[in-house]
Amino acid sequence: MNVNLRPAFVPCRRLAGAAQRVHQPPTASGAILLISLLLLATSLLAAPASLEQSALWTAGQEGYHTYRIPALLVTAKGSVLAFCEGRKTGSGDHGDVDLIAKRSTDGGRTWSPHSIVHEEGGDAKITIGNPCPVVDAKTGTIWLPFNRDNKAVFITSSTDDGKTWSAPRNISATTMKPDWDWVATGPGIGIQLTHGAHKGRLVIPSDHKHALASKQPEWNSHMMFSDDGGATWQISAPIQTGGNECQVIERADGSLLVNTRMQGEWQGLRGTATSTDGGATWTPIMHEKQLPCPKCQASLLRYDEKRLLFSNPFPPEPKDGKPSGARVHLTVRSSPDDGKTWPIAKRLHKGPSAYSSLARLPDGTLLCLYEGGEQRAYETLRLARFNLEWLTEAGSK
């Protein structure tokens, strides 16, 4: 038997026709379908919105009456350090107050017991506080400035990822003026500059109050900075005028933007100013009408090249046209254009809330350590862990 293994003959005209059908451009409806499928695939791949919250410190537990003034830092190795003031005998700003810290090596999911970074005088009424840490990306060293009784500036450092701390040194001689009678670092975090002539500079947002006899504006913000890796520190010109607790970021163009709590007549708004010389001098403060705020600290963080994040209490609209002074409803805001506009806002905590500190993990996850409670803002220091999808999802305003 003869078996013919050759393929069946197909006329060239039909092959040509088939080829034409295969290579015909898609119709408009086909293009729309393709785009729809791509958008669907993208949405399926996007991370779902996520928010987790828990109390990191609770008033009356772990040896202290109240925990206040949070600062949250991600180290060069990706560990998370949470700092605060442990107030032993009451919730007031002055008394027997220690600077304490907890440490996490799993992105803020679990934490070490707290340790005392610095305290003085045992049970004496000495206030150690206003933490404002910064990490030197070149060396991995963590620098932690703080205050004693708001009359002196000290700094300590860690070279082992926040496990232990050096003996503090007093740097008041180069970081205070003789006519100041009050000074504070932060509270919050400092930054290291990444652009231009001052690349590598460590910058610590700060504020001070002049003695009344000096006849200077009573309140002003300023910066502390170091150009030698933390060995020596100096201060900027004052940021005029009326600023208080502040935070600073470096913009994409290398300029600096400071956002400050306002004292006096502009208490209901935030203040902003800019610097083009690495923070040494500043424009006069402008009043930021997009960011209403009671008289309270706030947090400012760079998320990526253009996006900034901001957190603060956001009280309801006043009925009489006057800004509300209530510290309630901690809210996180997002700016897509380096702080020019703030179109996105999401409430993180409903009810009493006050100071906060934002941080970004290497994978983009966000953390916010903030003061919040049901009846009082200082019942707990709460840690929120969330992603950008939660902040930007529809209906977030």
PLM feature segments, named:
Residues 5-22, 26-27:
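Intrinsic, low-complexity polybasic segments
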Residues 25, 29-30, 72:
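Low-complexity, intrinsically disordered short segments enriched for Gly/Pro and polybasic residues
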Residues 47-397:
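Asp-box/BNR beta-propeller blade signature and adjacent active/binding-site loops
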